[in-house]
Amino acid sequence: MEINTRVGVEGHSSSNTVKKRIPIKVKEGNVNGLRELVKKMTTTQKDAFRKEYGNLLNLLEIEVQTPAIIALAQYYDPPLRCFTFQDFQLVPTVEEFEQILDLPLEGKTPYNYLGRYTPILTLAEIMKIHPVKLEKKVTVKGKVMGLPKGYLEWYLYQLMKKERWETFMDVLALVLYGVMLFPNVENFVDYAAITAFVAYKTQSENPVIAILAEVYGTFDQCYELKRKKMLCCLPVLYVWFVSRVSKGTLNAICPVEELLHCKPKLREPQEWVQLCADLNEEKVN
């Protein structure tokens, strides 16, 4: 975590004034069906999944308190791309996101979208499905192309019944990229998310920096374009924020597992608002 002390900065009072600048809605995707499917996996299978795809399964279990994200968003400082509170700034870092996602960058190439989406043949090979059959499932939603989450969940169920667990884990990771890491349209895995997943699967390109950039980009859109709905990377952002304002999480080997273990207090929306208003440098980890 990076904390910058900014005492007496113009435009930022040192009093604990409640801020409300942007009326945004934070929408977490429905992942209950995916959670039920994961319950069918053995411990060995879950361990194999984590070894290949990092902390996605633990992030799937995180119950995001969306009022926390709404309250945090009011302190986003677009020109500085950080969260400015009373007398300090919070800046999510690559190192923190590496830890949360359990995807170390060392020795890996960062994912960088090069302007071309994944060919259907490549995706079909990963999903072990005929390209023509898969192409028929590709649709357009919200002006973007991709695959419906409902279809992918159905396909996961078929793979589970046939005990094709290796393919099941690949398709599960694909869906989690679409609904949890790079969501754009509700209940839909678009080609941007598919391309990021395939780059990781086939080229070992690490998505951590892209996810952090997506967080910043989403907040920028909320402010500059008056975009009122926020879907992006909510479990990752929530874990980062709560681990900064909850005791005993900063030095955890994995803050996700720590949060699952300690079950953060369920707060009312106004409690999150006041928590952010009262934050100062002494109250953060």
What are these regions (language model features)?
Residues 1-285:
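Structural stabilizers in ordered domains
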